[in-house]
Amino acid sequence: MIYKLRDLLGVDELGGTMRLGRYACDLAPGSVARRIYGQDQIWERHRHRFEFNCLYEPTLAQNGMKVSGRSPDGKFVEIAELPSHPWFVAVQFHPEFQSKPLKPHPLFASFVEASYRHKTGGRGQEAVGSRVQVGHL
């Protein structure tokens, strides 16, 4: 389902061939990712040579997985999620590159929030995405 970037197929010398840097990602309406970020488009950092094989997308969609983030040109799947799961969000980028101890990345904050809700049976104040405050939980 994940393979080497199509632009690199047949390339053996991989020096300088990564998808590297900051790229835009359009978020699907009604998706978990859109709720977490609270916006239509995000910018995230990449450092990889791999991409999602879109030939598998119909089969995965039939089994509940939703592509919820794509590059603006539609070429790359950036985020996939399982809407039926309490918190299943898979990303192609590196959210840790934009996370700080006192300002966690929205994905990390949302994951901690979902974990807290799971542990407490949903009790406690909800804090979504980047609005989580350190020490709040």
Model regions and ranges:
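Amide-donor transfer/coupling interface in amidating biosynthetic enzymes
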Residues: 1-137
